[in-house]
Amino acid sequence: MALFLIIAGLAAFYALALFEVKLVVWGLVALGFAAVWQMLVGAGFAPLGVGSLLYIPGVLMVILSVPFIRRLLITAPIYGAVKKILPKVSRTEQEALDAGTVGWDAELFSGQPKWNKLLDIHKPALSAEEQAFMDGPAEEVCAMIDDWDTRNNRADMPEHVWTYLKENKFLGMLISKDHGGLGFSAQAQSMIVSKVACRSIAAGISVMVPNSLGPGELLEKYGTPAQKEKYLERLANGLEVPCFALTGPHAGSDAAGMRDSGVVCYGEHEGKEVLGVKLNWDKRYITLGPVATLLGLAFNLYDPDNLLGKGTDVGITLGLIPTNHKGVEIGRRHYPARSAFMNGPNSGKDVFIPLDWIIGGTEYCGQGWRMLMECLSSGRAISLPAIGTVSIKQALRVTSAYARIRRQFSIPVGVMEGVAEPLSRIVKDAYMYEGSRAVTAAMVDEGQKPSVISALLKYRTTEAMRDRMNDALDIHGGRAVCDGPANYLFSAYQTVPVAITVEGANILTRTLITFAQGALRAHPFLYSEISAAQNENAKEGLKAFDKAFAGHTAFMLRNIAGSLFHNITLGAFASSPTQGPLKKHYQQLHRYAQSFALVGDWVVVVLGGDIKRKQMLSGRMADILSDLYLWSTTLKRWEDDGAIAEDLPVVEAIVQDRIAAIEASFQQVFANFP
């Protein structure tokens, strides 16, 4: 009987953990178990009896379920300790955390994904107008481009190509129709950039940049009515060519270390003395900089006389400056990896601009980093994933054809296992990353700003671009190594280092941003706990912390129980939204998401602020998160494509690869855990 009760008790408490039951219920169950034990087993083996001892935890749990008592005895000491050890979050870090939204990434962090959050994301589709643009102007400009002439002879696109792009509003796809732009969806922008880039990377980047983070998007979201009226239609029609200057020679794109500054003062503008900003800056690696007519500029704004009423250290601010303005210096052009797209430095010394040249006016002074992060959350989800994905797809198209017609030892090289292996990697990545690109663009179209997903997708697509271009060159051999007008691979291969580096270098994105930021933004309770600990009102902070901490404790117990159960049963009882061929793959995804939630929780709890320094560990957790995301979007793509039976072996191979990669990453985390 005693053994039976022990097993029943463990099962009951396991169920309580699995369903995140409140503490008072735990206490009542413990008291009930103690009473049953005493009735059926008796006082037992000790002077007080085991049954009597079992009442103690039950009573304690019931008492601690009263919020006031729990805060006094348990939460308050923990709250005080957390406040002391919690690293101070800088203003730029806080704004980066506050920017963007969470969606499917939060489901993966929860360990119990709600499948409707994934499957309800609409299928990738273009409107009739967008499809007509793809079939018309996008097709025509591809026919106009001679990539060899562009990158080898001119190191620029011909003037007639530039003119066509401008006149057909390729540079104004994200600008709304109300302001003269095309107002295309994120899906359309991604597909158009992909199409142009597969013909010429230089042309693709030249189209991508004005439709990503820059003056157009910033003015659409934050510009004053006068600024929108003045610039948006001109930007949409190509009468103004924009660039955005953030990166500098000293701090890179780290805004916290930026040395570029502006001081609020009075100065002369158009013959009148007006209140404005005197700027000094030095920027590098600015795409479209050499040909831009309108310069977006990030700088630290200071107001020593508090003329704006915002204090002396106003913060990061964004300005909009015509490049022909007095004092603006456009430096000698860069040649990133010998690519043909325009890129170069710019600088200015004691350049005076009026206050109405600040994007959004004085209302947005000091809010520049938040503005940039909000735009980057969506822009980064569209641009580089499009370039990376289409490069892999193009590599697949030409390499699969080449492997069929190139013969060695009287047989096509494609039938050789040594060639089939890298070719299969290209096949799998082309399918997988097209699915992730399409789903992520659809998220943006639904109004999400997926900051964590955009970061992980940027680094994974561009790393995959590097790997699969290497595979393609290996299969082609000398055919791809010798550059010339008929070499259809070398342009993309040449651009790989650029894609790896821009919009957040992959080393930084993988090891510092993806998991660390994801844990704070997508974890169900962590962000609430940190916000409570930073609350200047200690009473309110303690109350909020108590609520979040109680939820976090239940969440952790559920993860322990759920992970143990699903791993022992190999995911046989995990959830799945379908009974079809993908059922087992959804169940395994649930199983590994549960394990990720458990391990991720312990990593954050144990390391705390040290997670910034344990970058190898953080990078491996980022790999697991990104593998889970790519796995889920692959399953969704198969459903969205109409469940094509011939694609199922590819899907299953992708899933097996993701499982192997996740298990390897887990093993490395465990082997190197501090």
Predicted segment positions?
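Amphipathic, small/basic residue-rich leader segments at the start of a protein or domain
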Residues: 9-14, 27-29, 33, 37, ...
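A short core secondary-structure module
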Residues: 272-328
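Flexible, small-/acidic-enriched active-site or ligand-binding loops
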Residues: 326-352
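A glycine-rich, basic-preceded beta-loop-alpha segment at the flavin cofactor/substrate interface
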Residues: 345-380, 397-414, 559-581, 592-612
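Glycine-rich phosphate/cofactor-binding loops in nucleotide/flavin-utilizing enzymes
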Residues: 368, 480-582, 674
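Loop-to-helix element that buttresses phosphate recognition and phosphoryl-transfer chemistry
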Residues: 418-445, 470-473, 628-637
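Charged, glycine-rich active-site and insertion segments that engage polyanionic ligands
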Residues: 448-480, 649-659
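C-terminal amphipathic alpha-helical interaction region
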Residues: 550-674
